[in-house]
Amino acid sequence: MSALGQITITVSRCWNTERNQTDKNPCLHGAYLQLRETVKNKSTHLKKPLMKQAPPWKDHLTFQPLHPAERKTQVWRWQSGNSSDLETTSSASPWPTGSNRDVVLNTLAESCCGLSELITAPPYAGVSIQGFSQIWVLFPFCGGTFHHNEKDVLGLQDFERESVSTSQSRNISLLTLGQLQNCVIGKLTIIDLLTEHLLGVRHGVICFPWGLPSSS
């Protein structure tokens, strides 16, 4: 089995845990998600500029004060280049044509309460989701029921994923980072399924500030 590419989702955060307060001046590497696809030594990067003004959280989430760089949602843009080019910038590259990257982006966005844009929150934000007693996570090849505990991540309540029909295989939502960390089924298996289904990539890698999640 040869690797067609690699997907890397990285979260960086800048938070003074010792003093339990944010820096007065936000750093340039504040919390952000970065999705990178590498195929045949060519990289395409999905990124969002920090500090871009946008309506806060679309009234779907309540939150405690965040790092200044994380108080706003940002718009994702694709940019070609290598990892050294991922500096904060106000420029926005046009959406690519003839690809399924928009499908990937929409699928990621749907994981956040059905929002039309993707949002992020650091583990220390105390974020809670209102009006949702369950989060449905549909995978094309997964069945059965699993539980995962959210009490230590994002302040969310427990959620239960129930079995779904394979006829719903095209309706896929992605677990949020906090949920994925505490999910008690094979995390890397889920990632492989998602990346292969969405991008045709057979090998996926996901990284967290607290390290690579291990399968349970």
From Swiss-Prot:
Cellular component aspect of the GO annotation: centrosome
Tissue specificity of this protein: Isoform 4 is expressed in placenta, lung, kidney and pancreas.
GO BP field: gamma-tubulin complex localization; mitotic cytokinesis
GO molecular-function term, one example from the UniProt record: protein homodimerization activity
Anything else known: Isoform 4 (talanin) of ZNF365 does not exist in rodents. In primates, a canonical intron-exon structure exist, with several stop codons preventing talanin production in old world and new world monkeys. It seems therefore that isoform 4 transcript emerged during primate evolution from a noncoding genomic sequence.
Function noted in UniProt: May play a role in uric acid excretion.
Associated disorder: Uric acid nephrolithiasis: A form of nephrolithiasis, a common multifactorial disease characterized by stones formation in the kidney and urinary tract. Nephrolithiasis is due to supersaturation of the urine by stone-forming constituents, including calcium, oxalate and uric acid. Crystals or foreign bodies can act as nidi, upon which ions from the supersaturated urine form microscopic crystalline structures. Uric acid nephrolithiasis occurs when the urine becomes overly concentrated with uric acid and accounts for 20% of all stones.
Record protein name field: Talanin
Source organism per UniProt: Homo sapiens (Human)
